[in-house]
């Protein structure tokens, strides 16, 4: 099963286990970051990013979905440019240091225009 919409992951997406993780992320999605209180810390075992096409009011656009896999089996997902940028760097760091578990803090902010946005921090 070749999945060409995978952007990046902290695990091997070519193995059966990796493909199951991606399948679950794409079909289940998990809990949205929008439903998490600001400052929520997720005990994570993996992160993946993939592309999906969203159709909003007849305007199809490609977006990056970021999914965090928690140690308890839960999934947390977001479609957010700021999350995607932070997660991309986080995936590099986790992969480089071969971290098996790590704590991700979901940070909520408000732009000068009043829009809510999310980002990620690595928590110690």
Curated annotation (Swiss-Prot):
InterPro entries, A to Z: Phi29_Phage_SSB
Subunit field text: Monomer.
Function: Single-stranded DNA binding protein required for the elongation during viral DNA replication by strand displacement. Displaced viral DNA strands are transiently coated with the ssDNA-binding protein and therefore protected againt nucleases. The latter is then probably removed by the replisome that performs lagging strand synthesis or during the events that lead up to the recombination process. Has helix-destabilizing activity since it removes secondary structure from the ssDNA in replicative intermediates.
BP term (GO), one: viral DNA genome replication
GO molecular function, one term: DNA binding
UniProt KW DNA-binding keyword: yes
Protein name: Single-stranded DNA-binding protein
Pfam families: Phi29_Phage_SSB
Keyword field contains DNA-binding: yes
Gene giving rise to this polypeptide: 5
Annotated keywords: DNA replication, DNA-binding, Early protein, Viral DNA replication
Top-level taxonomic group: Viruses
Annotated family: Belongs to the phi29likevirus single-strand-binding protein family.
